Amino acid sequence: NYKNLVISESAVIRLFVIATTVILLSIITGIVLSIRKAKKSNDKVWNVSSKRLVINFGIPLVTGGFFIVFLIEKEILSLVAPLTLLFYGLACVNASKYTLGDVRYLGITMIVLGLLSTWFLGYGLLFWALGFGVCHIVYGSMMYFKYDRN
């Protein structure tokens, strides 16, 4: 029950450190894999299209991140899980214009999961597992078999 949930300040700091670490490791992994792929195909990693991709992905994601931090500060915790899915989905849809069009479908799926998670408050971890776990595994597998498999 989110109404009776009390989180100590040290727990909030630990959760923030964990979340920041996961985000940074995800970004670093994405950059490393992009550099490797670009080198294999003799492409530039940083060009006009990649700059637009980062900007269009970053604006909704960073906005959502700040919004969620403000909600946590106000102890409105019930919306944290749904909003992470929702803003990530919006970022994917917004960035899909500058990358594979299939990213749009991942984004729409995340938006739907975020809205469902808002409707079914209290099941945020389940929706996180579906969105950030199952959907990414399925999406990654589909992209591998569609574009990268030799």
What are the language-model segments listed below?
Residues 9-17, 75-78, 82, 97-107, ...:
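Membrane-water interface of alpha-helical transmembrane segments
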Residues 16, 57, 66-70, 87, ...:
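Phenylalanine-focused residue identity feature
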Residues 37-42, 71-75, 146-150:
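Membrane-interfacial segments
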Residues 1-65, 69:
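Selected alpha-helical membrane-embedding segments in polytopic membrane proteins
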Residues 21-25, 29, 59, 63, ...:
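Lipid-exposed faces of alpha-helical membrane segments in multi-pass integral membrane proteins
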